[in-house]
Amino acid sequence: MKLKKTVVTTVVVAAMTVLAGCQSVPEARQQSVIEQLSSVSMLRQDNIAGAYEVAVAPGVDSVFVAAVPAFEPNSGGVVQRLDPRSLQVVQSIQLPRRSFALGFNPTSSTLYVGNTLDGSLTVIDATNGAVRGMIQLGERVVDGKGQVSAPHTRKVVVDPLRNQIFVTSPDSEGLVWIVDGATNKVRHTVETNGPWPAGAAFDRANNRLYVGQGGLNEVVVINPENGEIVNTLSTGDTTSADPKESKHFFVNMAIDEKNQRLFAADANTGSVYVFDLGNGKVVQIVPVGEGLLDIAYSEQRNEILATNRGVSRGSPAGTGSLTVIDGTNYSVNRRVDLPVHPNSVALSANGQTAYVTVKVPHGNDHPAWRKDAQDSIVRIDLQGG
């Protein structure tokens, strides 16, 4: 099968910068440029320092990006609100703690920000960007040098129907916190009996949380009502209880609720594992590439979208892409090159548009490294071919 391959350049539309800084340009002309950008099938803006996860919030006509501009002690985070059409930053929400993960409740218009290094959630009113509060999930400990540590958070998944939030904590003995969105209190703390619980996907109809990790049972199934593990799924490939012997690490997951399929992004092998939730068996393995990271499922298109960073310890100089997989036969429909390192992917409510954050190289040993380069947000019309 011949794949269609699309290359996205890192060039930011110069007209946007000119219009933003030149007050003499007529407003009508500026609006015309914005409308033109809104209609293109693919748009990239290199305008975010330290971008991580992206979330789409159609109820407030916004795309949010969690960002960590700096990692110095006591540095904070930023959540950038973007126009979903032009990808222009329309609001910057400063936070006292660094922001990595995002979960959105469309019913209450509440944005939950995962403060990974602090073991907490910041609660934001998505209608105006006001910070409503902070939920401390893991105990913060101060050592003799005054350094603060806490169990890290990872994925934030929201169930708007029951107003509950799920947060994974990837440690050698991992946890999942289940939070009541009405009270902002932790209802249950679940031990997953496995290392590094990271990815998570929620089945709304059956009220079941699927959590991906390493170890013997790469997926645990949790009943949020009582916080109990009711089932586990395994590839059967790992035979030792030693976490170092884990063959897989399901770093992110997505679910097809209608057809009861679970898609797991395996960071160890660079492949997507497809589980039949009816029998708990792996029905397909789809190779994607090195540095496989995030995954999303478009029910409307019956397509699986996966980002891979394109690098590994053995191949540190690569670049990544977004892979679009056919949900019927699991063939690759399309690869979209997104240099340098694609990170998080989220879908519009109608499943026809993808938003992807793309990170610059971490160090100057990468050939694409440039001083003061900014991370990016990319909008892709999946109907555009």
Roles of regions detected by a PLM:
Residues M1-Q23:
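Gram-negative bacterial Sec-dependent N-terminal signal peptides
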Residues V18-G385:
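Predominantly soluble domains enriched in secretory-pathway, periplasmic, or organellar proteins
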